[in-house]
Amino acid sequence: GEYTAIAIANPGGMMMEGSESLSTQMSSPRRVTVSGADVTGVELALEPLAAISGTVTSEPAPASALKDACKNPPRFYKEEIVIDARGEAKSKPEDEVLRMLNAFTRTTPNDQSEFTIGFLRPGVYRPEAQLPGENLFVKSMTLPPAAPSEKRIDAAKTGVRLKAGERVKGLILTIGEGAAGLKGRVVTGEEDKPPSEKTRVYLIPAEPDAADTVLRYFEADVTVDGAFSLGNIPPGSYWLVSREVTASDQDDAARNPLAWDAGGRLGLRFEGEATKKLIELAACQRLTNYVLKYSPLIKPSKASKKPPQ
């Protein structure tokens, strides 16, 4: 049969989450085929794992919003935020093993709002945050600039490239208050039925200066009854579009969010602008029962095998 071999060395004798696993070493996974006999000579080269460390800050909703929908916002604690780093998706069979180890990268800030995401193999990662309330959104995540005179680096846009054993420090994760939410359904045809094919919705920032703000892009799968839900959205102007999901894009673990790619963002904005329908989301607004009309792409018919007359 087919097997995946991987070696893990931890001086403490146990794998722990976050910063506790900074001294762990791991090999790249190797595919091994066993055909009725012992397999020898499999080499697994250990290399030190990398880490990203930083702090969490927060910004309250604007004073004007506190008088209306954001009045008396619920209190939250930074220690409740779950922080992770998502690597670029790969579809190799051996990467299934690495995905099972992702639980060890998750961490939470300490009482000083500091965190360390450990247990990371070489590659490009984008930090992510699971927020403890619908009133919150990720406003920015930045790294120190290469030179003091330059601006901080947008880690959500560029990702964080890690080498074996590298320790990247200084990530600032800023949490904003006053997030909006959007729920609705996608319908097709004259009878407003749910799409017959698997569909995904994309929320796209409409402001020109937000074209490359990756944290302003959202996507969600549409359920079989046509429903969708998007939350923790920064207030602003948006377009909403839907697309049929191709077979290669149905596995969330084996694909990247479309907004990670500059070309993906450009395509979404082109499609969104063509709708000429803006959605204005105010601070703390909960827009429900939104109906998005979707026109499925017409699949081309097969070419005739008969020669032209």
How should these model regions be labeled?
Residues 1-309:
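Long luminal/extracellular ectodomains of secretory-pathway precursor proteins
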